[in-house]
């Protein structure tokens, strides 16, 4: 049964605060990262350490950060990146993230194996089955893991295939994630490197999202 928007709204004070194991102020995303987890978050890990995960790792209500980019609220984040990387200008970095964050799905709710997508006052949902993971090696030499899920309901208008990437390689509650969505195949999504809509916990204010991004 689909998660209803009103249910998500009512639950904001209880459900989504606990679901991502996210405590703002102390930047606590559950238990502290181990050395292996910290290296994995930076794209360095042994393939043998990658483990399967369940959809419950992404349980919660999540907001797209694309509107924050469009409003200019993420400019301090891009400026920090430009200051740290002298090979790219602020404008180049912002353009890169503009392409990456672009999406019309404003909110995502995840509960009991069901993912609900909210777009322009329209809602689609489906129960997703786990389809394994894929380890990717990027041009930079760093690696990442995508966790694959499939909607097998032919009547659903939700994306047939979705993939999560959150810099985590083993079971752990997510604090933010990139998601890849489509109807062609998992492989076509694995080839997508330029558009990775990004979501943070819904209860965070824009200032808190910026603070989170600046701390990483």
From Swiss-Prot:
One GO molecular-function entry: cadmium ion binding
Pfam families in the cross-refs: ZinT
Residue positions binding Zn(2+) 1: 167, 176, 178
Compartments reported by the entry: Cytoplasm; Periplasm
Signal peptide positions on this chain: 1-23
Keywords from the UniProt entry: Cadmium, Cytoplasm, Metal-binding, Nickel, Periplasm, Signal, Zinc
Binding, Zn(2+) 2: 176, 212, 216
Induction trigger: Repressed by Zur. Up-regulated in response to extreme Zn(2+) deprivation. Also induced by cadmium and hydrogen peroxide.
GO CC, alphabetical: cytosol; outer membrane-bounded periplasmic space
InterPro entries named in the record: Calycin, ZinT_dom
Example GO biological process: cellular response to zinc ion starvation
Task performed by this protein: May function as a periplasmic zinc chaperone or mediate direct transport of zinc from the periplasm to the cytoplasm under zinc-limited conditions. Binds zinc with high affinity, and can also bind cadmium, mercury or nickel. Preferentially binds Zn(2+) over Cd(2+). Contains one high affinity metal binding site, and can bind additional metal ions at other sites.
Assigned protein family: Belongs to the calycin superfamily. ZinT family.
Protein name (database record): Metal-binding protein ZinT
Species, as recorded: Escherichia coli (strain K12)
